[in-house]
Structures are given as structure tokens and as C-alpha cells.
């Protein structure tokens, strides 16, 4: 099972923070610094997450920050292996069906799903009333992404679903 970590930037309402809820339920560990063997979810990374990345890392780390402040938050350099997620639709009530406007829990769940742990992805999302909505919107494409072996496979999948790559 993949270790789940979060760097809490504390930029959002703590009552609505999906990462804080994961920490509260013991599903994620809060960290102040990332390590070299963690996969850092970075929406500005040049490389897209692939299932083969699993052999490079021992954990997945989400950077919990406000989307409004994301460009500033990610100017900070984090140790680890940065990867962006392929295009996905948000299932959360704030950004419902917006492309790539995921909460931290949605991003972490998508990452562990693509890395081959769909049970962990379900466990993470089950703590949220709207968690099932994320899977309803993305189930088929997540299955396809989890089989992709290269960036060009991701591009083909995006074309198939008419999403920007």
C-alpha cells in the first residue's frame, strides 16, 4: 500500500479542507518537507503521472493549497519526483465538472488509482459525501490512464475522450 502524505499550506477554510479530513481519519500523514522518494503531485510539472512511476517512489504527496494561490505555492521547490495528473473532471461541489480543478483528496485518489491501488483510492474518497461523484465522472478514463505506458498513450486517451492533453 502506498503511503499518502500532504503538505498543508493552510490557505483554505480548514472546515472544508479535504487534506485536513484525510489527516484527521489517519489516511494521510502531514509533512512539512517532502523526501526524494515521494511522488509530488504538481499541476505545473512537465511530466504526466504513469503507472510505471510506482517503482520510483514509496509515497504520494499532495500539496494542499488554494487554487487561487497555486502558481505561487508551486514556485517553492519540493524534493521528490514531480508529476501532473492527466486531465480529469472535478467531482467536488465547488468545482463540479471543471477540468483539473481537483481537491487534494481527488488528486491523491486519482494518483493512487493510476498507480494501481483502486481500493486505496476508494477509501480516500469514501470520507466525502461527494467522493463517489468523482469516480462517476472519471471511472472509465481513470481505468484507461492506469493502463497507459507513455506520455503518447495519455495523449491518445485524451483525444479519445476529447480532452486537452
Where are these regions (language model features)?
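Extreme N-terminal starter segment of soluble prokaryotic enzymes
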Residues: 1-5
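Short beta-strand/turn micro-motifs composed of small residues
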Residues: 7-8, 64
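Active-site cofactor/cluster-binding pocket
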Residues: 15-103, 107-110, 114-143
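Long, charged alpha-helical interface segments
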Residues: 139-165
Amino acid at each position: 500500500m502506498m503511503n499518502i502524505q500532504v503538505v498543508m499550506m493552510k490557505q483554505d477554510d480548514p472546515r472544508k479542507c479535504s487534506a485536513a479530513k484525510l489527516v484527521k481519519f489517519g489516511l494521510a500523514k502531514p509533512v512539512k518537507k517532502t523526501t526524494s522518494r515521494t511522488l509530488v503531485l504538481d499541476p505545473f510539472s512537465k511530466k504526466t503521472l504513469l503507472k510505471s512511476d510506482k517503482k520510483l517512489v514509496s509515497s504520494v504527496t499532495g500539496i494542499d493549497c488554494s487554487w487561487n494561490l497555486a502558481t505561487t505555492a508551486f514556485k517553492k521547490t519540493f524534493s521528490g519526483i514531480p508529476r501532473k495528473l492527466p486531465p480529469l473532471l472535478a467531482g467536488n461541489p465547488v468545482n463540479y465538472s471543471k477540468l483539473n480543478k481537483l481537491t487534494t483528496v481527488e488528486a491523491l485518489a486519482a494518483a493512487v488509482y493510476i498507480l494501481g491501488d483502486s481500493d486505496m483510492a476508494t477509501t480516500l474518497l469514501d470520507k466525502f459525501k461527494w467522493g463517489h461523484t468523482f469516480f462517476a465522472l472519471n471511472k472509465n478514463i481513470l481505468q484507461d490512464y492506469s493502463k497507459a505506458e507513455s506520455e503518447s498513450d495519455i495523449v491518445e486517451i485524451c483525444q479519445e475522450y476529447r480532452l486537452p492533453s
